[in-house]
Amino acid sequence: AADVADGLDGAYEPLAHARAAALRGQILALMGEVSGDIEQILEAVTCLADVVEDLARDHSPLDWARMQAALGLALQILGEATAGERAFEQAVTCYERAGLVLADAPALALRAEASNGRALCLARSAELSGDLAVLDAAEAAFKIELAHRRAGVDPVSWALAQVNLARIYEARLDITGKDRGERASAALALQAALDVFAEEGLRSFTLIAIDAMERLRVRAVPRDGV
């Protein structure tokens, strides 16, 4: 990927050059995740950030969204490797930017990945900081999204918001160690999402919701709050 990117002139072939450079960044991020090499992950983040900066959104909105999501994932990997709250916050921004473009592509698997990544990074940021206010804000945002999207009009977006809301409930369980109804609320949201994904025949989305249901199933039952 590096050789291909180096062999392309970004001035004359900006999109091809951006795609090759982004692929290199994605490979570096995944290699760094497997090896635990933080320097390699940082190199991936820098590479992808440069690509995103150089490629205009209007040139190819879908490619721009893919690269924003790729940068989000690289930052997410960096956050996990370093327990860095700031990396997760930056990843959320990237996923949100990607989501703005992908909102009109309900069947695109990347949309599910970006939406799920955003929720995961919000939750991880809150878990690292222990700041329940972050979760409160995220929960409110997802509830507003649910209020604005009707299941019958835009079922996929509605179901994705349900999955994200469930992830926030999970994070609250992890942080507080108490169940004040979050487990049941998460299960209810995930089941609603699963029903939609199954009806729409969206396998990749269904797997995300099933994984979340499995996490709830095996999670140790926290003590009840008072």
Model-identified regions with their sequence ranges:
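Tetratricopeptide repeat
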Residues: 1-5, 24-25, 44-51, 70-74, ...
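Flexible helix-coil transition and linker loops at the boundaries of alpha-helical arrays
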Residues: 2-17, 34, 50-64, 81, ...
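Conserved alpha-helical positions within TPR/SEL1-like repeat arrays
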Residues: 16-33, 62-77, 109-124, 157-167, ...
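Short, charged, amphipathic alpha-helical segments
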Residues: 21, 39-46, 65-68, 86-93, ...
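Short coil/turn connectors between adjacent alpha-helices in alpha-solenoid helical repeat scaffolds
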Residues: 29-42, 76-90, 123-137, 171-185, ...
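Alpha-helical adaptor scaffolds
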Residues: 124, 128, 132-138, 143-157
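Intrinsically disordered, low-complexity segments enriched in Gly and acidic/Ser/Thr residues
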Residues: 130, 149-158, 163, 170-178
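C-terminal non-catalytic interaction modules
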Residues: 167, 171, 183-226
